[in-house]
Amino acid sequence: MRTEIAGITRANEGIQGITWSILGQTYVPKSLTDNSFSWHATFPPGTFVPPHIHPDQDEYLYILEGRLDFMLDGADEFATAGDTVRLPMGKPHGIFNKSQQAAKTLFWV
């Protein structure tokens, strides 16, 4: 069982120093428990997450910098800095950086 402990995960640091590079994006995990997971993500220009579904959890993004385009349950949308994106469980979604600038986000489930 993984429960939360009090503390601070510093900027540019992941839990236990972990950082992942997946499909050209950088993911830095910020918290992880049995009930919640959050991570900071950087999407360089031209990178994307292909459409997929999460069967067991809702997913959220808070856009920190830049712009991301989304396929949300078949509809095309976009979000910019300050926007919160809601990705309900069981609904298909894809994430695309079609801009010329990196986008930075905070994800959580």
Feature map (PLM): residue ranges:
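Short acidic-glycine-tyrosine-enriched beta hairpin
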Residues: 10-11, 74-92
